[in-house]
Amino acid sequence: MEIEASRQQTTVPVSVGGGNFPVGGLSPLSEAIWREKAPTEFVGDVSARLTWQDLTVMVTMGDGETQNVLEGLTGYAEPGSLTALMGPSGSGKSTMLDALASRLAANAFLSGTVLLNGRKTKLSFGTAAYVTQDDNLIGTLTVRETIWYSARVRLPDKMLRSEKRALVERTIIEMGLQDCADTVIGNWHLRGISGGEKRRVSIALEILMRPRLLFLDEPTSGLDSASAFFVTQTLRALSRDGRTVIASIHQPSSEVFELFDRLYLLSGGKTVYFGQASDAYEFFAQAGFPCPALRNPSDHFLRCINSDFDKVRATLKGSMKLRFEASDDPLEKITTAEAIRLLVDYYHTSDYYYTAKAKVEEISQFKGTILDSGGSQASFLLQTYTLTKRSFINMSRDFGYYWLRLLIYILVTVCIGTIYLNVGTSYSAILARGSCASFVFGFVTFMSIGGFPSFVEDMKVFQRERLNGHYGVAAFVIANTLSATPFLIMITFISGTICYFMVGLHPGFTHYLFFVLCLYASVTVVESLMMAIASIVPNFLMGIIIGAGIQGIFMLVSGFFRLPNDIPKPFWRYPMSYISFHFWALQGQYQNDLRGLTFDSQGSAFKIPGEYVLENVFQIDLHRSKWINLSVILSMIIIYRIIFFIMIKTNEDVTPWVRGYIARRRMKQKNGTQNTTVAPDGLTQSPSLRNYIATRTDGARRW
């Protein structure tokens, strides 16, 4: 675990992004992680120079047809610069960003050359970071807590706790989040920070380890003009600290556009312009499409290369809703498709293209040091402990995670208790006890699917952190299990106690203990099942439907609605009833409740032994102990959690490989070639997520 500071830390000013901030005295380890990554000179092993030449990305369709999403792109990104990728929707901005960051889909193939510091190398964790468009954050944590827990799962164990705190505060100041540092992120019932602040928190999480190369997918999407300007200004400040920043931008304002150092303009996957952002005005004017006065330059550039405007004009013209007036605008005289062709052709014959090409050649000749931060250095135990604590805090603060379910469980069990109040040992109590157990272990446990939306949110956070190599799958699965256990114990013991004593089930502490343990195990099995579903179903509505369907089938073969010996043997009896936890729960609870009791007979003075009821009414095997039934349910918890782990690993490793293999097969069959196991010459298939993460976490634990 972390080493506590045993001495008084001395406050020293540290220069970050042009400013001095007080940070606690740092050990040599901290210096190695931080000072060397925040230089004032963009040279040596502290810089990232990225070049791409003749970059082409081809995707395969379902019928084997291929389509070039990107075609012949050439450009570069240097330390200290903010490069913006712009273009209309569908122009290839996100694909280009994914290609440069090694995140292409399995059915996408890349050709051309992408070099980092003059070398073909994978982007390792700590060297490059990727900020997605969606801000998948834990809404119940404060900004400071969010960054703090992220630091703990990545920074080395041997680093002092006070140093980690200082680095977190430094990052908060760097991103301008100090005013909202103690405000919760916000969720469905907690009002939190603004959208722009959430975006800056997402960026702060990825710059915590001081990556040299930062990719951002539409960081200003969905933000108002002020928030978009603040976020972009922050990115510009980060680039001035020696980082190489590349961001895709959809529709920037004029103020935001002025913050860009370089502009890469795309249309239909082709380069329209690449160069200094300030030179784009002159380029469009030289190409015959000058920017009118009082018009936002970025709006004008996108207007020239967005063919959707032709469709709008045609629609309005057909409906007689567009008034045409004489204009000197060249776009009024030609179609947008023709304008795009003219701009693309002009760029490839202009000085801008040859200057960029020469610069790419120059940078490619410089063989810089291979950038590798060594991966996440936190131990597996520290990662698991931190994730468990973070998840526990989230569950305790989110009213809808477990607290609301606790209230519903109490309400339902009180209803059960009043309906079956003091059920007794009369003849009618035999079926009453059986139906009560069936409802408790069938429909009461069924309510656990209500937590599925929260599971989906957890998976979104995990996927974001996993893609950037924060921690492994095993740490997440174990932490999720441990953090939920206290809440599940609390829910089942409180509701189980109410039900047990109100109904008047078999008296005795061991009988009571078995009942609540069996209820806990059953609820936990449902939770584990829903977590496995959440790992493969991204939509919470679909997940609830699938989970409800599976549990409905399990209840049918539980042995109550249809007695065990009457269930059709093929499939339904074997194996369905044996993989249903309802079956084992009812088998155990029937024995727990009825064995040792005697019931009144109908029209006779003789008493009916509970053992007779078990064998002849409920068809229970008395040779199998009730504790064996409980142990089977407990083993199902482990099995479902293992399935949860396997499903995540399958989505990371197997699914991308299968999709890539199928894509290559279809492409080869379409082309009539013989080789069906390799990509075409010059094409490199995008790596699977496992390979991607493995290269980003080289030296760190992958599990």
From Swiss-Prot:
Binding site for ATP: 87-94
One Gene Ontology CC term in the entry: nucleus
Source taxonomy: Eukaryota, Viridiplantae, Streptophyta, Embryophyta, Tracheophyta
Matching SUPFAM superfamilies: P-loop containing nucleoside triphosphate hydrolases
GO biological process, one term: transmembrane transport
Presence of the UniProt keyword Transmembrane helix in the record: yes
Name listed for the protein in its UniProt record: ABC transporter G family member 11
Glycosylation site positions: 394, 671, 675
InterPro entries: AAA+_ATPase, ABC2_TM, ABC_transporter-like_ATP-bd, ABC_transporter-like_CS, ABCG_dom, P-loop_NTPase, Plant_ABCG
Gene from which this protein is expressed: ABCG11
Domain ABC transporter: 50-293
Organism whose genome encodes this protein: Arabidopsis thaliana (Mouse-ear cress)
Matching PANTHER family: ABC TRANSPORTER G FAMILY MEMBER 11
Record-annotated ABC transmembrane type-2 domain positions: 382-594
The entry's keywords: ATP-binding, Cell membrane, Glycoprotein, Membrane, Nucleotide-binding, Phosphoprotein, Transmembrane, Transmembrane helix, Transport
